[in-house]
């Protein structure tokens, strides 16, 4: 068995981007004595965490899913966004048998096609050109009853982007076959991932029953009125669009086909479960239509659903390599990022490797995380210090969600507090490692909190950034420096630190400079 330092830690500070401009920079504005000391006393480098470096289109901001996939894979992983874009360009998208089957069922049943998902150019969960391609495909195949159920972003893009996006979408629909927007819902409701079923139910009910607190004659009015209520895009209450008789334009009914065009799994699962699971118990479904439900990508490997772009298996990811060497590993995070240190870090696979323990700390049950910027970081730290001291683990992977999740709120003061809370936790963890000769790489998956104000508009900036991220080596003096690199270089670096040869599938390179 390879000789392991006990333990070697990978600490991922979600949303901890690197930016030298101080204005709107919660990272630089915060008091961070522990991180400052580490930067001063230990080797560090910058890593690319966006665009082509993580398998996304050039210039596109990074995100947590893609970041953790690249970290765990040790190679650039070409993301669903890129794969789908290529299929549209080469025409394969319009021949996709899963889409064609959904359309053929609509024709056979004289029913409706419903396109549900996030209307956003953010490229994190969805991408508007993919919706455009589906609308074009429906027109090409002669469908007359095509309805869009628009989830609004305001998180991966500025908080009041939806009105302009909806206007453009309506114009596109008029030019390409007349698809109609039937409902709008903020992603806070339609894309919850923390089992806050009361939110998911509101989205489900507007889709299946046309039942909602608000209604509007068109989607633009729905968004405008939501702004008037003080709601930004993410928080727009589910709203049904009605016809001249004030009846819903469309609801999802028996024999309809539904295409969920989000390509990222974590925030698509709950609503999908509500539609398709026989044993669903999140809430009482007043109506459960019998439909043909298509997922753009694989949302849940336990569900036998048609998937337009199936998962591409990654072999010899970090967790698998460690397990093959007989090493013990721990993955620890709070709810908001638990999937990232497990599912995504393991190459998009649900399976747990032999020797892999997992620790989930519940995220606080509050409306928005600016109300509790520390989130569950202190509880995570209590637990991980105990696990470090146990001597059980060779490798520990930890994620602190604070800088990303609080950064998404756009509340600068809260983001500063989030950074400071994480810094306190880093101080405790480093001390625990020092006592037993442990080693750590401290890094991030993408930026966020370093840019809380939009430099062009002066408005709050709630999205991720395309800035690089730091990687700090904490340990003994054998590592003299770190080379600039990409997120995919982290796994090879960890393997070198622990004395394991890099598998041929890992094309990333070690960051270590030892001479």
Swiss-Prot record:
The EC number(s) attached to this protein equal 5.4.2.12
Under Gene3D superfamilies, the record lists:
Alkaline Phosphatase, subunit A, BPG-independent phosphoglycerate mutase, domain B
Q: Which GO terms describe its biological process?
A: carbohydrate metabolic process; glucose catabolic process; glycolytic process
Q: Where does Mn(2+) 1 bind?
A: 404, 408, 464
EC primary class: isomerase
Q: How is the cofactor bound?
A: Binds 2 manganese ions per subunit.
Q: What reaction does this enzyme carry out catalytically?
A: (2R)-2-phosphoglycerate = (2R)-3-phosphoglycerate
Q: Which residues bind Mn(2+) 2?
A: 14, 64, 445-446
The alphabetized UniProt keywords are: Glycolysis, Isomerase, Manganese, Metal-binding
What exactly does this protein do?
A: Catalyzes the interconversion of 2-phosphoglycerate and 3-phosphoglycerate.
Which family does the record claim for this protein? Belongs to the BPG-independent phosphoglycerate mutase family.
Q: What is this protein called?
A: 2,3-bisphosphoglycerate-independent phosphoglycerate mutase 1
Organism whose genome encodes this protein: Methanosarcina acetivorans (strain ATCC 35395 / DSM 2834 / JCM 12185 / C2A)
């Amino acid at each position: 068995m390879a000789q392991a330092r006990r333990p070697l830690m990978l600490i991922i500070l979600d949303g901890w981007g690197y930016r030298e401009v101080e204005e709107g920079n919660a990272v630089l504005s915060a008091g961070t004595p522990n991180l400052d000391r580490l930067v001063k006393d230990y080797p560090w480098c910058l890593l690319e965490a966006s665009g082509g470096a993580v398998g996304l289109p050039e210039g596109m901001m990074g995100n947590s899913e893609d970041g953790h996939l690249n970290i765990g894979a040790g190679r650039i992983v070409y993301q669903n966004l890129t794969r789908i874009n290529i299929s549209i360009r080469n025409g394969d998208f319009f021949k996709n048998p899963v889409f064609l089957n959904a359309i053929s069922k609509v024709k056979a049943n004289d029913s409706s096609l419903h396109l549900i998902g996030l209307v956003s150019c953010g490229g994190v969960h969805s991408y508007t050109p993919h919706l455009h391609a589906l609308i074009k495909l429906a027109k090409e195949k002669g469908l007359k009853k095509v309805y869009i159920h628009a989830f609004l972003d305001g998180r991966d893009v500025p908080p009041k982007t939806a009105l302009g996006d909806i206007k453009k979408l309506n114009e596109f629909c008029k030019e390409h076959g007349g698809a109609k927007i039937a409902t709008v819902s903020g992603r806070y409701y339609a894309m919850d991932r923390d089992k806050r079923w009361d939110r998911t139910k509101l989205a489900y009910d507007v889709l299946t029953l046309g039942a909602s607190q608000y209604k509007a004659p068109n989607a633009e009015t729905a968004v405008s009125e939501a702004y008037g209520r003080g709601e930004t895009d993410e928080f727009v209450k589910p709203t049904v669009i009605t016809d001249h008789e004030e009846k819903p334009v469309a609801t999802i009914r028996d024999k309809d086909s539904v295409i969920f065009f989000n390509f990222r799994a974590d925030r698509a699962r709950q609503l999908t479960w509500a539609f398709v699971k026989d044993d669903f118990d999140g809430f009482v479904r007043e109506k459960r239509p019998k439909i043909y439900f298509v997922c753009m990508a694989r949302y849940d490997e336990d569900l036998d659903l048609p998937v337009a772009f199936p998962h591409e298996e990654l072999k010899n990811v970090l967790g698998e390599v460690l397990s093959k060497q007989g090493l013990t590993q721990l993955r620890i995070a709070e709810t908001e990022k638990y999937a990232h240190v497990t599912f995504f870090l393991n190459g998009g696979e649900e399976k747990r490797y032999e020797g892999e323990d997992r620790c989930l700390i519940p995220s606080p049950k509050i409306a928005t995380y600016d109300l509790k910027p520390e989130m569950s970081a202190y509880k995570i730290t209590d637990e991980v210090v105990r696990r470090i001291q146990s001597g059980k683990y060779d490798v520990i992977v930890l994620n602190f969600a604070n800088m990303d999740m609080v950064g998404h709120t756009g509340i600068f003061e809260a983001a500063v507090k989030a950074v400071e809370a994480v810094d306190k936790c880093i101080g405790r963890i480093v001390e625990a490692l020092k006592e037993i000769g442990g080693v750590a790489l401290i890094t991030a998956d993408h930026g966020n909190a370093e840019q809380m104000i939009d430099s062009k508009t002066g408005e709050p900036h709630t999205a991720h950034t395309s800035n690089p991220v730091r990687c700090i080596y904490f340990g003994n003096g054998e590592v003299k420096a770190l080379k600039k690199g990409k997120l995919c270089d982290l796994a090879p670096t960890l393997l070198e630190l622990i004395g394991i040869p890099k598998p041929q599938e890992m094309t990333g390179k070690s960051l270590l400079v030892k001479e």
